[in-house]
Amino acid sequence: GTSDKRANKLMHSLYAPLLSKGAKYVNSSRRGAELIKYASNAFLATKITFINELANLSEKIGVNIEDISIGMGLDKRIGGRFLRAGPAYGGSCFPKDTRAIVDTAKEFKTDLSIIKNVIKSNENRSKILLNRVSKLLKNKIKNKRITFLGVTFKANTDDMRESSSLVMIPSLISKGAKIKYYDPSGYKKDFDKFKNVSFSENIKSACIDADMIIIHTEWNDFKALNFKKLSSKKNVIVYDMRNILSPDKMKKDKINYFGIGR
C-alpha cells in the first residue's frame, strides 16, 4: 500500500520483475493493504475452522470428511485448498491476524462476529481432539505411553508458534500420560520443562512401546510407515489427526486405526 504517487511509482519499479510475468498489482492505500492481509488470512482460517467443524459432524453421522472436502473443492467458487480437516490452525500468521482484525474492528466499534467465532472454535479444537484421545483410550490416560509424530504446526518447518501440540501434550501430561515425540525438524525445546516427555531421535524409538501413536503433523516421513513393526504393543492405537494414511490399508494390515471425521 502507498500514500502518494511517488511511493506508488517506486512500488511498481520494485515489483516490475513479477509484474512482467503476469502478477497483479492492486493500487491500495496503506490501510487498505493491511486490511487485505488480515482479511485474506482470516478467510483461510475460516475455511480451516469450517472443515474442522464439519469433521465433527461427519464423525457423528458416519460419513467421510475427505469426501466432503473433495466434493466442495470441485466447486471453483470454493476451491479445495485449506479444506483439510485436522488440528487447530497455528503458525505466525493466522492466529495473529485473526486477532488483529477483530481488535481493529473493535477499535472502530464494528463487530466481526464470524471471525470472533472462528477464533473461539479454533481455540476449542484441541479440547475436542483430546476428548477423542481419552475416549479411544477408554478414559484411562494415566501411565499410558503416547507418541506424537510431529509437533510443529505444519510440515516442512520447525515453526512451533501456536502449534496445537503445545496445548495437547501438556494436557495429556497433567492426566498422567507418558509422552514421547519425534519431529523430522529436530525441534525439541518447548517440552524440556515437562516431566514424562522425551524427544526421540527416530521414529522407531519414539513408537517402540507406545499404547497410542498420534500423527500430529503431516510430514511425508509418516505416510508409508509399517505400524505393525513400530510398536511392541499388539493393540497399539494409531490416531491420524491429518488423515494422511489410507483407512483401507490400515484395515487390511489389521491396525487399530482412527482418523479425523471418518
Give residue spans per PLM region.
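Structural/interface elements that position substrates and couple domains in central-metabolism enzymes
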Residues: 1-262
